[in-house]
Amino acid sequence: MSVRYPLLNRELGILGFNERVLAQAADPQVPLLERLRFICITSSNLDEFFEVRMAGLQEQIRDNPGALTPDGMSLQHAYDLVVERAQRLVHRQYTMLHETVLPALEQEGIYFHAADTWNDEQLEWARRYFLDELLPVLTPIGLDPAHPFPRVLNKSLNFVVELEGRDAFGRQAVMGIVQAPRALPRVVRMPQALSGFEHGFVLLSTFMQRFVGELFPQLVVKSCNQFRITRNSELFVDEDEITNLRVALQGELPARHLGNAVRLEVSADTPAHIVRRLLEESLLDEKDCYRVAGSVNLVRLMQIPDLVDRPDLKFAPFTASIPPVIANAPAMFDAIDDGDILLHHPYESFQPVLELLQQAAKDPSVVAIKQTIYRTGTDSPLMDALMAAARNGKEVTVVVELLARFDEETNINWASQLEAVGAHVVYGVVGHKCHAKMMLIVRRVVESGKATLRRYVHLGTGNYHPRTARLYTDFGLMTADQKICEDVHHVFQQLTGIGGELTLHELWQSPFTLHPRIIESIRAEIDNARAGKRARVVAKMNALLEPTVIAALYEASQAGVKVDLIVRGVCALKPGVPGLSENITVRSIVGRFLEHHRIYYFHADGAEEVYLSSADWMDRNLFRRVEVAFPIRERKLKRRVIAEGLSVCLGDNQSAWLMQSDGHYRRRRAGKTLRNAQLGLLAKFCS
């Protein structure tokens, strides 16, 4: 299929998503400490955006300046538009923090003490803290021919100090650099008796700016300003040269902190000549400098909601439910034997997934366990269960994706621990990240008086990560359906062995059948619409970028297919364009939880085909990753997925944003009845 249809810019779409996240911080219906958290989440998202997307744009401009972006802009023009919008977003973020959120926190007894507000007792406490806890760890670097400008680590907190006078060796002091080690706390609690507030805090940068002169004795400090450099964090691994992926990665990881600079953040009051020097040392242009009114890293404030015991200023706690079929069963295998089980996280607990693996590790009837791991965290009971299974003599095989961005080191550590207890560890297929979420358990059972091997499978849309399972919306399926189990077995064969493509009967798998099946399903809806039948596509995902899928959706709209897309993040498709996409709607749900499940619905002339998947409709997921989409066949479970995963989002009029044909979003206006997808599901499932 030739792609001749218009697309929207990816980078601008990512910034648009972060604008929607930041809008949560402005919503008075969101608890105050959660509003602060949304500001911090925006900062964290922007860090990754610059480390990956902006770094990639800069590289493309250097390597191929005449090239065009997929949406048809010159690279430089696209870069300039993205920088302009990013600057506006950062300005809005800091304005919201200082003019709205921090004053509201102060009214609630949560206060950040600036140095110019300290009384004598507070000043003495701060001085002692600096001298006792901070000074021994800090290393000042004076800049002169013998001390060149240091290589600043990625996203580290640094201070540039303008000096006057001569040092002990008679050298004229001009400038110094102080790097704040990551071991130092970024936020320090002031004793309540001194603070006068129930929760008083002092930022590390406040200590530094007030007492930095202690690091440069007998010199005059003319100015002290914080700065932060963001670097290209993509890892380069030559797939043709490596013989051991883990060893190659271990050699590359330290270099991540020293990649090419892509962004400079400085406090707004930094003198112009200092900014010029920092830009020169970083090989950056003026447009790459972000002057901020306050701390250069708002992510450091993410810990405040956890440090402040004010439940009234946070989202209400909830207890995820356990389905009765699991709660009433003697063991997980008995529950699955009774029929397929659908889990909807975070509303339903992730604990049954852990219990399935933990019971398998101890069950003498279990002979083998196979598992994929993409992200699981540094302290994972799931990994503990896999290691326990290996120690108990089970045949344990784990496909660990070492190239899961920013989790490489964690996954390398888990791979080493698994190998140490005798598990088989493989790293998937070089060149194709393993993003599929699969667990396969093989158990010896007696059926009709005869011993046989029975397979059990868990498939999911999200990671095997107990912490994010309480923060992200995802579906998981537990089944003993032997066709699905056989397909999962074949996928593991491909990941761990070498051989030709195996035929799958139930699963769609990238990079082989997933993309063709999606296109075929859309084309079937087009054919039905042209035949005068009802036709509909509803899809939910994190991102929609793949051009041929977008082209198929445009053609579907022109044929009269009703297309509803629920895309949380970036979407390159233009909805609502007359003659092109007037039958397509795109909405984004942004709320308490991160919308994460991927759902594909096709009306299929009334048969209603529903697939769950780990894959977004992006080039990388469809062609450069190992992904699976799995069908929901059981009628009751299918109705649940449609109702809980799709219909509630389409009906949401509180947390939904509707995409306009120019790529901008507007909030959906609430009707007479307020409907919030996430709150409704919390009320349905949780106590």
Swiss-Prot record:
Mg(2+) binds at residues 375, 405. Disulfide bonds: none annotated. ATP binds at residues 45, 472, 568, 596. An intermediate of this reaction is the autophosphorylated ppk in which a phosphate is covalently linked to a histidine residue through a N-P bond. GO terms for cellular component: polyphosphate kinase complex. It is an enzyme of class 2 (transferase). PANTHER family: POLYPHOSPHATE KINASE. This is Polyphosphate kinase. It comes from Burkholderia ambifaria (strain MC40-6). The lineage of its organism: Bacteria, Pseudomonadati, Pseudomonadota, Betaproteobacteria, Burkholderiales. The gene is ppk.
